């Protein structure tokens, strides 16, 4: 073998026999030596000349060495002599060439460079020798071939990671030698070699060596791409040898990076091979990474490469499947998204691969939160290209709330490339539709098949010189109406083969559907409403027939379309009537008779208009109904989208809005129709984020569903009574003048619009509405868990309410405590006056509920009228205050109270007792505090029944003024009093912190606690007598008829008052009984008594046995005299009459010091009987207190 000699001594260049005294072997000079090898000896004087000569030689040879080596290697002509079998002479010439290269290297002046050249020369020489060997095409290579070539390739790969080595290897022609070895290796042994392991290893090492040698070396890349047969060999290896595809894909990746036009053209055949390799190796993550990286670079070279990637079977599907937000596959996803960024540019301008676009968009939206900036940038670029001309993809992104939110987040990114890409996507999503009428037919797959079916007038509509397309502005389309109408020319391909007749024209992208005027050679369709009567349907059919005669040329086509439309309308009408009849039958069997409505209630009150509680759906709800839910609008808003009034062109803008409003008188739905539609389609309208399932109906048969169009719809608001009803119960229709108004297209929720926008209360619907309103009012009022929501005062009976008969049980004793009176179940004919009063009372309830700290009118009982005091917002009371109320309640319950109640319940009164009772009531009615109310006196049985039905909790509601506390709330049963008999607190005061600051406690008729028979005869509860409730604590003697309420006077007392200090001397004279638990007592806030004399009080002075206490108030002379006279008379009566029953002690008076007491305006007394009381003069800082 010719290469054996060079293998034995690679450093040997030639032999010389002329030298004497030598071995004849020329050794290389020592590295770094500046002397030439010569037998001539120089003198010392010649040293300077030699150094100068060497300097000139170094400058000359610095440039000549690389060029000389290149010229020597170019003489080999590997590409041209590839098929020529070398001879021995050729082997000798190659050996001489290597010696000349070595001689040139030794002449290199740069020591480091010379060293690197000498290091790379042996491996390059070995590769060239193997080229000569492979030219001979040996059938079976010797063992030395594999070992020598494998060792040389390992050395090259190891050293090729250094940049300087790559430079000298390029000078020594190592790139061309490796390319020629690869070509000859594949050509000689083939892909399916006999010894695949060895040859695959050699080819793998060649690919790795070339990948490293071409890194950053543009000259090496150009030479390798232009090398004859190399790219074809690489393509063959990639396709036929998948085991080493990865390394050759890496080689192509390096060659395709920053490639010029010549390199791109040379690498174009590798695109198809790499696409196939990616499809086959997509399950192997490491194998497909380099392949996708090469395709990423190649996809940006030319449109042809993009088309090749898209046309490769399953290539786009593989790319879509590889899109994953998993961080482990970041490098893989970066390459996949990079390919899609370039490929999407090709897809944006073509109509191919439409079925994969939605999949690609969906998968790429999940990558917006990726941690890789490269992945995010590539994804945004691909999305921007895919949606720029496809409104379907734009709508899909708009409906993805998470994707839209992430896009808005990426707008604030710190990277310019990401912000630029996001800006492109958002601009496309936010701009209106820029496509024209016929563009959608191509983008959805119509193609040439749809265009071939167009007639001459139809083709005119598609051309750009048409008036509509020449002047129409995309700004006329709203932002929401992103999906244009597909038009009548788009049909499924199977349907086009069966039915060759064109369909009825549908609506366009700009005009409302009811606009049926011919414009520029085409006619717009009208909206279809299933509730049209027969006359309107015939009229619509006639208009359709006229349109068909204009649009279609032949009479047969028009008749066929006319027949189809009539069949469709008749079928819809029959279905509608059948469902209506079934619903009416069910309504007649199950529904109760609806009471007739009152004419006075036809006008909605401000309360109803403000709350809108009469409908389950509100105009402001997020689920605003649709045409299918009986909203009586003049337009089919679910099908119109929001482009209701857009003109065809600027020239066709109508002079008046009424020219675009050809609508019909739509019949209003009856109650049965409403029940039928609402029961079946209560929840059929979706939100705007999803597709509405209300089907679009046009005058013609719609071949393409329109349910993805997001259109504004409105909810129904009591559709049974939307419009004003006539006395006979029918719903009048609007006139044509009213419907011609453009404001009727989309009625808004204005309070000043016609009454048809709001519901009317009447009949059974009113009761439901009242209950809803009541619950809404009560829910807004602050409540307490321990107290009832409202306390009712019986003295308000009859105020602002109609006169009714007294019933034994409350009309609103339902657990819900609804203040609205409920109609009796046995009443069949409702009273119109009562309904009217109920409406007024409902209005008053609503008004008063919004007024804080004011009396609320509420129908408490059926025959009376009372006030409701709203529970003020307050902080919780302390334990001492709650204890005060319990003690006050305990102190007032005596056995005499039980006996009095039992007498009032179980036995009839004597005439004397009744007369005594009536006089007491008259005196109360005549007083100013009682409002002059007159209530009918019920019998004892009625009072007992009412007493048994009233039951409330035991604790008092301290948040309410005591004069509004109804005694019906308290339980006076015998069992209740037994719980407190042992806890009686004689020291209990009548004061409570819960009393309103503007109320005065008038306790002139407080019981002394004795069980006398006189008390049993004259005492009864305010529940039995309908007497006024007083401002005394719960459980006290407030049930006595003689208790009066003082007039309210404004005061500035806001803070809690301390416990009044008593006179010690008087306390010693009148010791109080000691009880187990003694608590501090708090006085009420200071108030003023009204300066007015009550002449009626003289008539009841002899009927009472209680002492009057006036607290914290200056009194006039007449009032003070009356107080002392009453005290003396009562003291005299007590001394004359013996104690009855259990012998209660005689009440005595004591003087205690009040907190804010003022000096009385008088100084003396007129009654001579008060001489024994002279020693007790009124002290300005004292008050009169009766000790029981």
Curated annotation (Swiss-Prot):
Question: What function is annotated for this protein?
Answer: Has a role in endoderm cell specification and pharyngeal development. Required for the migration of epithelial cells, organization of the anterior seam cells and ceh-13 expression during embryo morphogenesis. Prevents hyperactivation of the Wnt signaling pathway during endoderm development, probably by preventing hmp-2 nuclear translocation. During larval development, apr-1 is required for expression of lin-39 in P3-8.p. Shown to negatively regulate Wnt signaling in vulval precursor cells.
Compositionally biased intervals (Polar residues): 604-624, 677-701, 778-788, 800-811, 909-929, 937-946, 1014-1039, 1164-1180
The residue ranges flagged as biased composition, category Basic and acidic residues, are: 832-843, 871-900
Principal place of residence: other
Family according to the record = Belongs to the adenomatous polyposis coli (APC) family.
Q: Where is this region: Required for interaction with bar-1 and hmp-2?
A: 1-486
Species in which this protein is naturally found:
Caenorhabditis elegans
Keywords annotated in UniProt: Cell cycle, Cell division, Cell junction, Cytoplasm, Developmental protein, Nucleus, Protein transport, Transport, Wnt signaling pathway
Q: Give residue ranges of the ARM repeats.
A: 314-358
For this record, an example GO cellular component is: nucleus
This protein's encoding gene = apr-1
Q: What is the lineage of its organism?
A: Eukaryota, Metazoa, Ecdysozoa, Nematoda, Chromadorea
Q: Say what happens when this gene is deleted.
A: Worms exhibit lack of endoderm, excessive pharyngeal tissue and premature division of the E daughter blastomeres during embryogenesis. Two-thirds arrest during embryogenesis and the remaining third during the L1 stage. RNAi-mediated knockdown causes partial nuclear re-localization of hmp-2 in the embryonic epidermis and the production of supernumerary gut nuclei probably resulting from epithelial cell hyperproliferation.
Family matches, as InterPro entries: Apc_fam (IPR026818), ARM-like (IPR011989), ARM-type_fold (IPR016024)
Protein name listed in UniProt: Adenomatous polyposis coli protein-related protein 1
Q: What is the effect of changing residue 338 to E?
A: In bp298; at the L4 larval stage, seam cells divide asymmetrically as opposed to symmetrically leading to an increased number of seam cells at the young adult stage
Q: Which GO terms describe its biological process?
A: asymmetric cell division; canonical Wnt signaling pathway; cell fate specification; cell migration; embryo development ending in birth or egg hatching; embryonic digestive tract morphogenesis; embryonic morphogenesis; endoderm development
Region Required for interaction with pry-1: what ranges? 600-1188
